[in-house]
Structure formats: structure tokens, C-alpha cells
Amino acid sequence: MLGGGGVTGGVYEIGALRALDLLAVNRTVNQFDVYVGTSAGSFVASLAANGVTPEEMMRVVNQQVPTPFRDINMGTVLKPNYVDFAKALAVMPLRTVGVLRELASNVGNVGLMDLVFGLAEGLPSGMYSTEGTEKYLREVLGDPDRTNDFRSLENELYLTATDLDTCERIVLGAGDWDDVPISAAASASTSLPMIYKPVELKGRQLIDGGIRSTTNVDIAVEAGATFVVVVNPLVPYVNDFQKVIPTMLGSRVRRVADMGFPQIGYQSFKLLAHQRLHEAVRHWEEKYPGVDIILIEPDPNDELMFETHILDFNKRVDIARHGFESVTLKLAEDYERLREVCARHGIEVSATRVRKVVKRFEEERESTAAWRRILEQTTGALLRQSGQA
């Protein structure tokens, strides 16, 4: 199960999947029976369900040749919403005159926000369109070895979106929604409000699935899953007050409020999503008896995950490394329990080979290059180079 978090969250998930692939001796992350994706996780889940490995995804993200398909860039992810902007330019002059006339009759009782909300209906429904990512995913899944049809997959894939008008959770790939192309479903699931315009499918206006529910464990359980791995990149930052900023009188500790309104909004959104998730976590055991659930997420003191905005493409290697390290941290915290849980489901895991691979490459002088090799090379190649095969 893969949650949201924009480009940053998606790359974090690729790193986590890479570590899980290396950890499991007799399975790969492409052999799960059920994949559930929400927001950015829907993009990654769509590729994984189609057999694309984490290292192949990372090679594409890093634009490393050879790649299994065309690389992705910010021009694909951030395609301006030209249609809505054109409409706004056409109607805004008349809209402005009408709003000003209406407000003029009530001078003294109006403020700036009255003007903003008065003009809002003439503004675009989002700065960007998901048309670029939909087209890209459609091309990738159009390969003869892959499919853009939920019904043609060997495993099960479910992507969630939210109906903007009714507030319902829409499970794309299930019931009446299984005939929607996977690429269209993923574009709807990733339509973060105000950033991206809503996506219309079957007459419904759909937005980011993470708005309604963060991870959707119930979907996997209802599909018959008894072992569920949840990767959640959305964790609010817990300030340790170690960083300082200069002031006229010297310096003081840095606070989230110093980072501007985008980070304040992002922190608030992650806090709500994380609180909702962990409220659900507390009831997982009694709600889903007989189901083993493992949760993987960043450390709350992880400054890189917090400072990197959700559409930042430049820090992808570092973010993927953090995803990888979240899995190794999970190993360090409770390896015996993890090993026992995996064994119950016929999965053999080895912390030793993960440690040996990381140790082998961390000895190199250039850390970024070493981590790129860990993230981009096949498991077999890594094991051979670390003397384990």
C-alpha cells in the first residue's frame, strides 16, 4: 500500500521498495497479490503492478541510460493548466467589473478577502493539469509487456480518488470503475486540489485520493490480503530546535513559521493526514484480526523530508535514500518480529545482505554515486559486488 506526498513521496516510496526487494530473499515487490495506491502512490503502484522494478523506476527518475522507458521530468509532471487560464483571461475583466460594482454598494463593510472570494469563480481550477502524467503513463503502460487495463493485470490494482462534489472515496479498479484506464485513474488520484485541476471520469469530478483517506488498508484486506506493507511518506516534522537563524540581535532557534506559508500549510496537511492514519493504526489489530500489517514511514525529525517541497525533482537521490533507510531503520528497531511476521507468510528475509550491500558501497568516497548504484542496480548485481553471490 503506497500513500501520497507528491514527487517527493513517490521517490521516497521507490527507495523503500528497493530496500524491501533487497531484504526479501525469495520474493520481490513485484510479486504482491494486491497493490493499493493513493495520490503519488498510485503512480508507483501502477508501475509495480505492471512488473516495473524499483531499480528500473529509479533509473528512469534519475534519467540514467539505459532505461526501460522514456524518462520523466518536471515538464511532464507540471503541465500548466492552459485551458483554464485562457478561460480566466477571457472572463476576468467582466468578472472584476461586476464584483467591484457589487462591493461598491457596501463600502466600509468589505475587505480584501471579499474581493478575493468574489473573483475566485473566475480563477482556474488548478495551476497545473495532470494531462502530462496521464499521457506519460499511458505510453509506458502501452508497452506489449504491460497493460493500461485493470482487468488484464495478473495481480489486483486499486487506486483511490475523492469525488469533489459528494466527498465519496472512489476505488478505481473495483466494481463499476474497473473499465477506467489505469493512466486516467492514476491522474485522478494524483490531482492535489489547487495545484492540479480536478479530473473528470464518468461525469464525476475527482481529486487526490489522500484527501479522503491516507492509506486505505481496508481495500487490501477486503481483497483477501493477510500481509500488508504500508509505505507512508507523509509525516509531520517535529522540530528539535537545533537549527538557528540570524536576527538583528544575534540568533534564535528556527521555527516552522519562519519557513513561509507553503511550509505552514504543508505541515498542517501532513499533521492531519498522519493523525488520521495513526488513529486507524491503533485499531488495526482488533479491526483486522489475522492480518499482519507493517508500517514504514520517515522519522519525524527528518529535516530533508520536511524541507523538500512535494514537487521538488532535484533531491530525488537523497529522498530515495531516505526511503531505503526507513526500511533499514525498521529492521534495526524490531528485526525479530519482522522476520517472524514475514515467515508466517512464506517470505524469507535477510538483514545481513542489506547491511553488507550498504557497507560495501558506503566505503566509496562519493556517497551520492554509491547510493545511485544501490538504488539503480539489480539485486543480483549488488550481491555479486558485495561478495554475497
Where are these regions (language model features)?
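Patatin-like phospholipase
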Residues: M1-T38, F43-A389
